[in-house]
From Swiss-Prot:
GO biological process, one term: CENP-A containing chromatin assembly
Record GO cellular component, one term: chromosome, centromeric core domain
Full protein name: CENP-A histone chaperone scm3
Keywords, sorted A to Z: Cytoplasm, Nucleus
A GO molecular-function annotation: protein heterodimerization activity
Amino acid sequence: MCNRQPKAVDLPPNYSCPHLLSFQSVEFNTNPTACDDVFCKRIESEKKYNDFLESLFKKYGRDTSDIADEVDLATGEIIVNNGHLEALKTKDDIWDPTFNNLEISASNGYEKKLDSSIGNPGEKAVSPVHIEDFQSPQIYKFKNLSLRDEMVSDCVFADEVPLASLFVENVCNETIPSQSCVRLKINDKTRKVDASALEKKSCLLPNSSGTLTDQRGLDTIKHKSIEQNEILHVISDTLSSPRRRNPLLSSPKTPLRRSFSKSKVRNSNSTKRRNFISLISMISPRPNLSTHHFNLGFQPLSQQTSFSGSSTQNPHSSSTCKKAFCFQCISESKKC
C-alpha cells in the first residue's frame, strides 16, 4: 500500500486571486482512496509474476539449438536430424518415403472408402443409380403390402407436380385401405392417383411394357401432352380440397367439430335480441325500430299488425289496460 504525502504547490508571482491574496503557497492533503489501493496492488502483483518467470528460466531454461532438429519449411526435408522427428514419425505421415506425393495418398484413401461403401467383391455390384436411389426419400407406411412391393424406390418428382403429392398415397392407404389405386408413369416418374377420379378424367391404363396405351389399342404418342395435363389436374384436384371437405380423405371416426367461439357469439347475440324484444313487449304503444339510431335490422311486423287492428276496434283506456307498466296510462293520468 502506497502512502502519498501532501505536497506544497507554489503559485506564480503574477498569480492574482481575490480569495488567496494573503497566501504564498497552498497545501493539499490527499488521502489514498480505494482506486489507489487497487492500482498499487496490480503493480505489485505484476512485478511479482515477472520475477517468478525470470527465476524459472534461470533455473530450468537452457539453449536447445545444439540438440533440436531443423526442418526446411520450403521442401519439408530434415536438415539437422537428431532423432526427435524420426521417433514421432508413423507410416501414414506425409514425409513417409512410401508416399512421395500428397495427392496420391489422398486418392488412395478415397478409393479405399469407396470400395468399403460399395461392399465385398463377392457381393452383388452396386451401380451409381442404386446409390442415388438409396439416398432418395421414401415412404415407409403402407397398409397394402402389394403396393409396397411394386413401388419403385426412386421418388424423383416433376417440376409441375406439387411436393405435397408425395403424401397422397399414404393418406389414402391410412383412411381407406380398400381404395384401389392405379399407377401411372409420366416421363419415368411414378405417380398413383385415385381410380374413381381417374375414370372420370381419362381412360388410359398402363401396360406391361411401362408405356401408356389406350383401352382401344390406339397409339397415345399424339395425346401425350393431353394425358399429362389430365393426370396433373386429377392430382391437383385431390390436393387442393381440404381434408375435412373431401369425403375420401376424411376419417368417419372423427366427426367435424363445431367452432365453440362462433357458437358462443351467436348465442350471445340471440340472447341480446330476445331480451330486447321482451323489453319492448312491455311498452305500449310499441315504438318504430326504424326511427332509432340502434336499428337492429328486424321489425316485428306481426305484432304491429295485431296492435294496429286492436287499436281500431278497441281503443285504449286505463280501466281496461291489464299491463303492469304502460306509458299511455301514465300520460293520461298526468293529463287528468
